[in-house]
Structure formats: C-alpha cells, structure tokens
Amino acid sequence: SMQYILLDSWEAGMQNWTDKMIDEFTIRRGYDPSPYLPCLAGRVIGNSDISDRFLWDFRRTLADMFAENHYKAITEYLHDQGIKTYSEASGVSLEILEDVLLCKKYVDIPMGEFWRGIMHPDLMYYQDVRGAASASHIYGKNIVATESFTGGGFDSPQALKETGDYWFTQGVNRIIFHTSAHQPLDTKPGNTMVGTHINRNITSAEQAAPFMNYLSRHSYMLQQGLFVADLVYLLNEGAPSTVPIWGSGLSPAPPEGYDYDYINADALLDRVSVAGSKL
C-alpha cells in the first residue's frame, strides 16, 4: 500500500490572498487589517512606520498560513489515511513569502534538491540542502532527503558518485532520484524528460547494483547518530524567512572547520534551552 506522498517544490506562483484572509489576520495579529489594506498597493496609511509595521504583520501572516494551512494541513490529513509526507517545502524558487524551516517542520521528511551538471554546487542548491538538514536537526527528525541529480541526462555512475559524495557531506542521508520513470515499454531511451535518467533502459542498468548499494549503505550509516553543530544562524523573524539562497551566502562566514545549522524564531523559542552559558 502507499506509505508516502511527496510534495515537490512550490512552483505555483505567488499566492497572497484567500477568502478568509481578514479573519486569519485578525486572529493571528490581534487587529482588523481592513483599514490598512491600501498599503498593499503602495499607499501610506497613517505614516511610513505604521504602514511598514502592517506590511511586516501581513507578510508574517502569509508565512504562518503557508506553513500551517498548507503543509501542516496536508500532513495531518494524510496521517489520518496512514500516509506520511516528504516535501521540499517550499523549494528554491522562493515564489511565496515563507518561513522555510517552519514549512519543513510540518512534514515528516524534509527535503532539498541538488542538480547534476553546471549547477553543482551552485549556491542556491547548497543552501537549500543545508536548510533541509537544519530543519531535520532542529525539529528532531533523522532523515534528510533530496531530489537528487536533477538536470544532467545520461551521466555515468562514476559521475553521479562524485556529485552524491559531496551532498552526503552537506547533510543528505536519503537519495530520491530525479528521474526514474515507471514505464512498460522497452524502447530506448524511453520516457526521459528532465533529470538524470535512472531506469532499466540505460546502458549501465545491468551493472548498477554496486552503485545503488553504495548509495544505500552511505544513507543508512549517515542516518545513525546525532548531528552536533558548532554554530547556529538565526534566520529573519519576518517573512520571507529563508536561507541565503541568493547573494554571497553566509555573512559572517563560519570559521574554517566549524559546522552549523540554521534556526528560526519558532525553534529558538520552543526547542532551544540554555545550560550555563551554552545554547
């Protein structure tokens, strides 16, 4: 029977309104947003400080709603059916005002993605994977999955191993191939589409067992034990609250030899304790 549903990266464009938006905002922020809605069209209500405060509240409300009314709601519904969730919640496209770690909190297995080819190890995919690993660590989950080897084409197991090894060092411990098409036809190359092709029609298929066993054993070993970060980077409390996918990355950069996780305000308030002078 079906055990998991996978929610891919959000690629549905920006969503910033719903029929219950006024009610949702009022409950979450404690005041009626109606007088301030012209701020969404660039108007100033009261003064710039008041308008900016409303916009902060509005964006934060959207982030909370994406996490709770989408990812949490889907996960709870599927749990009632005996099904768990994987999700990139919400992915590298950054199409929504999200709290990326909060979105990943509400799925069973948080995911990132990495590509094979010219985008390895492009900053946005590097940060996306580190975000998935951070969500798993700070919210007490032991699996960090990735949409793996996207892009590419007909790469050899040797080339895929090099890429996979790098991402194992960044926190990945479960590989989900992009793409392995379920197809009855033996015509070659078959249904290929985008992604590295992992199916019985590729030339290395009959010799694939050692590589698959290699990935499986690494994944299993990396799922054991407990990650210990030297540093945590607190993400923006407002929205969007996401890992630094664009730009030059972490600032300040961690000292050489030190590892880190990201943390959001939710985890800082609810999952962090202080013993002596240490978090």
Q: What are these model-predicted stretches?
A:
Residues 3-4, 9-279:
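Carbohydrate-binding surfaces of carbohydrate-active enzymes
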